[in-house]
Amino acid sequence: DEFDLENILDLFIDPTDGLIGPFDFANVIVKGKMGSGKTMYLRANYAYYLHTLVPCLLEHDSIILPVYIKLSDFQHLKDPKEIYDSILVKIIEEILAVCDHLKSAEEMTRLHKGAITLTGNWSTDNALIKIGNRLKELSADEYVEKIANSCETKGGIVNHFFEVCANYNKSKSIEIKSHRTPEFSDVVYAMRELITPFNGKLLILFDEIGSINKLFFKNDENGDSYFEILMNQLRTISNIRTKLAVYPNTSSDILKETRYGDVVALECDAINHPELYSSYSIKIISLIEKYISKAIEEACSSEEIFDISTQNQLLIEQLINASSGNMRRLVHLLDSSMNQAYKRNNGNGKIILDDIIDALKKQGADMENLYQSDDVDFLINISKFCKTRSTYRFSYPNKGTTISKFTNNSEEYNIIEIGQYGTGRKGTIYYFDYAYCIYKDLPTHYIKNSEKIDKTRSHITGDPIRRVAQLTDGLMAQSMVPGKIDGEITFLVADKSAGFIKGNDDREYFFSNKNIIKDDVKRAYYVKHKVRFLPSFFTDNEKKEISIATEIEVL
């Protein structure tokens, strides 16, 4: 939202793969959590088609008119019909607003700057490439003069376009806004009067859909919601396409059929899907280079700023893991890591892995500081429990309400995330945020084909931990017992009723199955099984010290 339109395409990273392009004239549903880049995607489309609109008019080529609508403008409305009517009016208003936008000489200069840079980079349309090449031959002043002449010349194509818009605005538009309830036929009429004479098409970009009242997405008595009615009406017009920004698994995420458009997913869970890492990391490196190059106004490679190479990108991988596919958070962490590097050496040298780790620890601490001391104690106890189980995932039956305060804070500051919602007798599986794992030294990866902790946390040397620690109030109480140590079973009698444990203090401890805590008494255990216990020491009649393991947790 903070970027000017002429800068959007310089900073835009194409999230699509394969034959699908980000600026195809097609129906698209853009899905992603808050901060994943949905608005950037739609604004880039708006900038792209706005930059090419007047050049296409000048060359008598078919035009595509972009209309960008933020539905948050209607979040104060409650009645679904009123929301529907307001959107119809907004579509027509925005078509006319584009016309006014194009009349400004200053705006034409900015659009010229955008137009001469975008065509070679983004367009696969031969006509647009030719137009772009001709534009590059003109200076900004010459471009504005050419458009001004076309605007002032009677019969000029741009003049004709502006006249049509002005005449429509004087008659039909004012009538709709002032005197009667709008109908979808008004949009059809506006298309026929304003765009069809120029062999034109309309691209409607709907942003912030999730901000409007949920009733807009609920089915009425006839079976369809007003949202579905609107989308079906737009879908049936051959020269209209829509691109929508939707939060997944919310009330607005109801368009499941492909007739409403292909889905562009703006999330990437690179930890749990390492096969996505390679293509995603290329996009991240491109983002780094685009943002820095734009800021310093000269080309800059990521290797000039970060201590990375083609063979070693562990530094970037840590940022990718911590961002969880959230672009806004990624940029924040990039900024924070650069700040850590600057504080470390006053701007000399590159950003190194230690700077990234410090930035992630700071992020984890900042997240924790959002909570009261009792909540922090609860978090610390769960994290300690998970650490003894060599995981960062857990389930905690009947604690959903308590845990929800850590999962519902925001998309960027949730210390705990939901990995899998509980169904039936299966409980919900939670996991700690990656930055918080770094802050609390929680393990996230095993070394490949083993259960040894991979401290590098890399997909090259390790696999993400899938183990889920099963928490109960009893186990939570045990995790807070002072003096407990870790150990490993070294010997069991035939019926497994007793045996010996070697503690991490290198002492041998006798144990009986009666010493196992109630929550774990039914769990299987075997030689080399990891346990946690409270060491107890007794002196027998011969004054020999006997070491016994009590309060045993089977890990």
Q: At which residue positions do the language-model features occur?
A:
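Conserved AAA+ ATPase small/helical "lid" subdomain
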Residues: 105, 109, 285-350
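C-terminal leucine-rich, beta-strand-based interaction scaffolds used for sensing/assembly
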Residues: 322-325, 329, 339, 346-484, ...
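OB-fold/S1-family single-stranded nucleic acid-binding modules
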Residues: 536-555
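Short nucleic-acid-contacting surface segments enriched for D/E, G, S/T with interspersed K/R
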Residues: 516-534
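The catalytic "switch" region of P-loop NTPases
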Residues: 181-312
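A short, basic N-terminal segment
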Residues: 1-28, 52-57
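P-loop NTPase nucleotide-binding core
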Residues: 26-27, 32-202, 212, 248
